[in-house]
Structures are given as structure tokens and as C-alpha cells.
Amino acid sequence: MKMQYQQIKSQYSDCLLFFRLGDFYEMFDEDARVASRELDLALTTRDRSVADPEQRTPMCGVPYHSCQTYIARLIAKGYKVAICEQIEDPVTAKGLVKRDVIRIITPGTVTDASMLEEGKSNYLGAVYYESGKCAAAFCDISTGEFCVAAFEGDNLSHVLNELGRFAPRELIMNKGAAETKTIPDFAQKKLGCLLEMGGDDYEYMACAARVCEQFGLSSIDEAGLGDAPAAVSAAGALLRYISETQKTDMAHIRRIDLFTGGRYMELDWATRRSLELTESLRTGEKRGSLLWVLDKTKTPMGGRELRAWIERPLLSPIAIKRRLSAVDELFKDNVARGELIDTLRGMGDMQRLIGRVVYGTANGRDLIVLRDCAAALPRIVELLKPFKSALLRSISELDTLEEIHMRINWAICDDPPFSVREGGILKPGYSDQVDHLRNIRDNGAQAVAELEAKERIRTGIKKLKIGYNKVFGYYIDVPKSAGDVKIPDNYIRKQTLVSNERYFTPELKELETTLLTASDKIKQLEYDFFMDLCSTIAEQVAKVQATAEAIAQLDVLCAFAEVAVRNDYCMPEVDASGELIIREGRHPVVEQTLSDIAFVPNDTQLNCDGNRVAIVTGPNMAGKSTYMRQTALITLMAQIGSFVPAKSAVIGVVDRVFTRIGASDDLASGQSTFMLEMSEVANILSHATAQSLLILDEIGRGTSTYDGMAIARAVLEYCADKKKLGAKTMFATHYHELAALEGSVEGVHNYSISAKKQGDSLVFLRKIVPGAADDSYGIEVAKLAGVPDKVVSKAKTYLRQFEAEAASPKAKKPEKDDQISLVDAGTDEVGRILRSTDINSLTPLEALNLLSELQQKARG
């Protein structure tokens, strides 16, 4: 047995091997040490007879019926677990029982419900990068979702954005991707996912064949991948990894979704985090995020669909309006919406249920849940009949899965056991054979009595009895006192005693075998019938998946309508105008966290022409960041098809939303706050377009005043300039000198958050008004924050001193054109460089680098 273990273990050296021995999964050697440490299991040994403890084989084990709990703990810690089962019956096995690994469980290949988060997809990813071509593929094997994205050029930001969007638990890479360091660093540090090397799995022809076979394609062109060889390699490598770990049919992975430009908005990591789309920046939890506000879904698949919609805002006004029209109908019909929500509330996770059915890991309870889901479908279709919107009409045409409901309802008892191998799953009447065996098992004594009576009549021996003992089993006892009677020819003598003879007949032997093996036969037959039923249901995987997807969409639409009613949202007008007009907008998350204070709504108006850039000034803590974030969130909410927290809103679709809000030192990568800020600014200016929305908060604050002011102005002017960018931009700053740009830079306007002083106190009014703020009230904010009075008093003294010095004739004046003086005009080298530079040809990053170079030269 040890040799068998070592042979199997050698094939799965990167896994913890769960080796089936009877009712336990055992681990040996180093696996045992790891499992003992990680699972708090007692470490024992099989060979206690060995004198030297160091030579003994360490081992530990877990019961097979509760192994999922232990496996889940190991997977959560990043381990891979190989399940090695007995693949033949130990009773009939000749010699050593055959064993083999039937499945490898990894963080990205989990299907067991106890290891999965209901409202969150569990993605496995693959990345391919070579010769400037990059692609990524993602699959949630618990549901069958399979997505592919391809990117052109050497810029890795797109693939990083997709990694951030899907957040895979596990990622496989080819050598080229691993050598970038950018991809593995992002995956490990930002996502915390397990990394695997793909080896030779990315060879194009093999990958193309694998993709075609899996999705039933005659050629790669049918999937839209004819011009995307990198995507084919990523998808093929992912399919191979799934096949190697799952070792079973993947029939539920049947549709490939190609992420192409023009469908979904791309969101970078910084934007996703700073806007707190799915988790709070402070706690990392769902509470405090946009997802938390919008998630009134009632089904697990609806929860995952909502998360996907938030992560994938739409770019097509037509597709957005399709969702909004459906939400509007549900919003207006409280009765139907309430009944739909009540019906959805009792539905289980159809997507993952059908996945387990296909994989062969479903149990009786799973089928009962699937049956109950199917039972609710006719009512949902009935409730949707009056609606006219295209999306709700489409959903109402879902397959009600009547055949699946009928088959499960006929076969499976209402309260089946958890295990499918212990019997008790099938209803009476489903199988005559099972019913007969159950009757024998439950009425064995009656069967024996009936045979005994039958034999008495047949033989005429009134004292004939049928008895049983553990040595001889069942026997017919004929007392010698019965006299000279004729013993039937089919009676076979088993034992002779002093006063009686014991016989058996073929019929009695068959009854004995039946009685003694009835339970085992029942278990095997019920298991076989159950697996046959699962196979029949699995053949309808396409219908179940389509219905589950429709229910998930309906769940999200109902949630949007319910949130809109509860929170007083309005239906936005979405178009391609480039306008962004929000009346009395509110921050969707902040307003839900305020208990006794009413949220102060504010207007926003931006467009692609005369009102492109809004400079927002005002005190710290007054709400500048909240105001800008709410504008971004309202825009994103509209583009996922949700109503928005405002009195009215016109949202011209934006292609990207970028944010540069707040920062903290990235010590792990050696980046300071300022360096991180500049990296993010460079990324924004490199990828934004005139159709983007930019949210920039206090650019340049991480360096000296004049350096920061210079950078802030340069960035702001670049954003405003139609020839360079011309994007809709909200720009919060404490550099009040930038207010002078209104009127001198086309498209720039000043706004401020009002505040007023009452004695020594500062009152935040939270209202956005036209014009620049006249003061930052920094000292007043310091006082509000609890800075000691002596420090505040000293600060006021210094402030008066600095203001007096600034007003003095000796104070250095800015240049006449109000341009910020970056360098001493007498610095010849700096002047020469400036005169010879074509500023209009510089990229944002080149401009920042040039600015840094000039600063160093000016300082000597």
C-alpha cells in the first residue's frame, strides 16, 4: 500500500494527497506534517514497531464524510488538494484495492457550495503575453461562465484592469507573462491569488483544437477569435488546466463570451477601489460599498449578476435603455414587483446546482432545490406577462423546466439524506426493484414465515421450521419425530443433529442472500438510479443555464426597482450627447450611512464644450471628495441600468471613469505617496479620451508648494485642452491660484463648497456654489479635528505673519501673465530647454519628466 501511495503522490507532488483508506482520508510523510499543522490534527504513525522514531512514517487523517470542512480550510490557505479514491469495491477486489486521483481541488476550481461565497463568482484565470500580444481568459467552473479578452500592444494596463475586474482566486501564466513581473506582482499583491505556470499549455494549434472541441466549433473564427491568437492560447490553456484538475466532463462550460471594445467600460484598480464599488476601502467589507446599497437581490445568482453589472458598466445607450425601461416598469408596479420578489426569495442557486449535476457531485438535496426552483418558474412567467419592455418580455420567455421538475418530483423523496450512497433517496413507486428489496429488508421475518408455511403445506411436515444462526445462515429444520416422511428432492442436507435434520433449498438460499444483501443492493440501485437521473438532467444543461441567467437578470432588475422606490431615485436620461447634468444629486452610499443628518444634494453640469473642467475648492472636510465621487457613482449607476440618487439626471455615456483620490505610501513597492500619485496621473492622462470622466483630487499635494502647483496647473490645462484631451474633469484643489484659469483657459469654471465662520467655529454648509473659495480654513479644520488650542493659536500667529510677508512689496511677485514661476528666469540652461521644446508634442508622462528635470537644473 505504501508503494501505491508513493507512486500516486509522485504524480501530484504539488498537492496535499487525500488518500482514501476505508472511512478516512489519510495523509502521510510531509503532507501529514502540513495537514497536522494547518488543521490542528494529531500526528500519528503506522509503523510503531520501528525503533527509531525518525524512521517512522508520520500520518494523520480526516473522516471522509466530513472532509469538505478540512479541504475548505486548506484551500483558503492556498493549498491544492488531490482526492485519491478507491476505484473498486474492497469486497470484490483481489489483492490491493485500486486507487486513483479523481479530482484536484484548488482555489480556482472549487465547486462545493460550502467552499463558495454565494453572491460572488469564483474565477480561475489564464494570461498569455508574448511579442506584444496579450490576452486573458477567465472561468467560474461552478457556473460554467467562460470569458476571453484580447489586447493589442505592449501596454499591460488593460490586462491588469481585467484581472482587477474578475479578481481570480488562481492564475496560470505562460513564461512571457511571468517574466513581465508586473502581472504576477499585481496578481499576488493586489488580488492575493495563487499563481501557476502554464508550461507548454499555450501552444496555439493545440489550444485552438481544445477550444473548438469544448464549444462545438468548426473553426476558431466562429468564436470571433480568428484574429486573436493570444486569446486562443489563453483560453486553450485554461481549458486544459480545468480538464487536468477536474478529470470529468465539462459540458456546462458551453459558451465563450468575448470581451471586445465597445461593450463594457474598462475600470482600473485605483478607480474601482477609490469609488468603493464592491467593498469598503476602509474595512474591505461589502458594507459601505455601492454593491451594499444596491444589493436587494434574493437569489445567489442574482447577487453574482449584480456584482458583474457593477464591474462591467455598459457603453451602448441602447443596451442601457433596455435595462432602464425594465426597471421603470417594475418601479411603477409595486404589486407585481412585490410578488416577483417574494417568488424569487425562495429560489436556490440554479447555476451552481446544474454545475454540480454535470460534474456528478450533486446530492439529493441539490435536486430538491432544483425542483423547487423549477416549481416557481410558471408563476414568474405569469407575473411577467403584463409587462411591455423588451428585456422583461425576453425574460418571460424562459423555459419553465417542466420535465426536470416532473422527473425530480417523481424520483426524489422530499427530505433526502446528504449522502447519495446511503440509500433513502428514491420515493416509493419509482422503482419496482427497489420497492421489492425495501419490502424484503423491512419485512424479512414475514418473508421467512411465508416460506415456512409454504414448505409445511408442500411437505406435509407440520413441525417444519425455518431457523437462522450466524454459522450456517438460514436452514429448514425437520424434527426426526416427524417419522418416516418423504424429504423433497430439492432439500439439501446442511447439518445432522441428534433430534433433527437441517436442510436448505435453492429458494431459501436465494432468500437468505436477498435478506442479507438487500440493504447493500438498495444503496447501489438507488445510487445508480440517482446518477441516471442526474445524467438525464445534465443533458438539459443549456436550458437550465439560460433559465438561471434570465432569473438572475430579473432579480437584479427587481432589486434596482426596489432600491429606487426605497431611496427616492430617479430614472436617468442616457444618451450619447456628452452632457452630464445632475440635479440635486446625492452620494448613494453616504446618504445611507447618515442617521440623524439629511444629506445635502448638489447639482453637477459638465459637457464636452464650454463646461469641461470644474475646479472645486473649499475647506478640508467640507465634502469636495464626496461630491466628486457621487458624480462618478451616479454616472456608473446610470450605465449599469440603475436609477440614480438625484431629482433628475442626463448622462451622456462616458467611455472610462478615472479617479485620483487619496493615497497612502506603497512601502512594499518602494513608492511614496507622491510617486504613487504621479504614476496614477500618468496612467490617467495616457488612457483617457475626450469621452472620459476624470475625478482628480488635490493633484500635486505630495511635494513642495510650487512644484505641486506647477504640476496641478499643467495637468489641469492638459485635461481642458481639446487638442490634447478635452475630457470632462472635476478637479479639487487647495491651490487657490488655479482659480485664475477661469476665463483664461477655455472650458474651465470654478465651483466651491460653501462654509461660514460663526465666531471661532466653522460650519460646513455642504453646498456647491459657483465661484472659487476665498479660504481653505485649514486652521479652523485643525481645531475641529482636536488639535490642541496652543498649537492652533500658534498657527494663527504664523498665518498672520506669512500673509503679511506675502503682502509686502519685497515679496516675490508672480509673472505678469499669472503663469506660475517654475524657474529663475536667469537660469540659461532651463530657458534654453524651454525655448527648444515643442510642448504640444509631449505626452503627459514626458511632460512630468521634463518638469522634474527642469526643477533639478533650476536648483543647481
Give a label for each model feature.
Residues 29, 228, 298, 307-309, ...:
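ATPase nucleotide-binding head domains, primarily ABC-like/P-loop NTPase cores
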Residues 359, 363, 376, 393, ...:
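Charged, surface-exposed helical/loop "interaction arms" that form contiguous linear patches used
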Residues 1-329, 338, 345-358, 362-453, ...:
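Charged catalytic and DNA/RNA-contacting regions of genome-maintenance
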Residues 363, 853, 857-859:
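Short, small/acidic-rich helices and loops at N termini and domain boundaries
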Residues 497-535:
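Extended, charged coiled-coil "arm/hinge" scaffolds of SMC/Rad50-like chromosome-maintenance ATPases
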Residues 3-7, 14, 534, 552, ...:
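Conserved phosphate-binding elements of NTP-dependent enzyme cores
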Residues 321, 378, 438-441, 445, ...:
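Alpha-helical coiled-coil heptad-repeat register
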